[in-house]
Amino acid sequence: MIQRVQTIYLFLAIICLGSTCLGLEFFRFVQSNEAFSFSVFGIESLKEASSSMFKSIPIYLSVIGLCLFLFMTLMSYKNLKRQLKWARSCTFLYAVFVLVSIVFYYAGGGIISEGQYARELGLGYALLIAGFPFCFLAQLGIKKDKKLLDSLDRLR
């Protein structure tokens, strides 16, 4: 299992996505007297003297679910057809998750607060984006292995 490069790619995607559950912020909307920080635990309002948490968006459930789905894909290495199908599903779900975060980055400031605000990217956003190529490369590696095994079966 560890000899295959897609195992390493899937493991790196799990690490990148799972590390966002440590509370790293994805992005922040900053105004003159207030800032809104968006992480996997929700949206936190940071005022000058106090902070309050809005847990209306539980992103951590989808992050943990996607990490578990990536792990299941990693562990189904004996059945390449199923692993390829699951890897494609993981890549699609990961792409949807990234696209939703990009849309919220551009439209979220207007939803949360009125007036002028500045956007700041956090380390969690970079890790979220960094895991997507690993997921895609794992899918390509699984496809290459399946093609190699199918050609060997054809020669028998």
Residue ranges and their predicted role:
Residues 10-25, 89-98:
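Hydrophobic alpha-helical membrane-insertion segments
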Residues 71-94, 152-156:
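Cytoplasmic juxtamembrane regions at transmembrane-helix boundaries
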Residues 21-28, 71-78, 102-109, 136-142:
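Transmembrane helix-loop junctions and nearby membrane-interface residues
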Residues 2-11, 24, 34, 45, ...:
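Extended, charge-rich alpha-helical interface modules
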Residues 1-14, 81-88:
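Alpha-helical transmembrane segments and their helix-start/interface "positive-inside/aromatic belt" motifs
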Residues 3, 14-61:
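Interfacial loop at the N-terminal end of multi-pass membrane proteins
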Residues 98-156:
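Alpha-helical transmembrane segments of multi-pass integral membrane proteins
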Residues 57-73:
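Hydrophobic alpha-helical transmembrane segments
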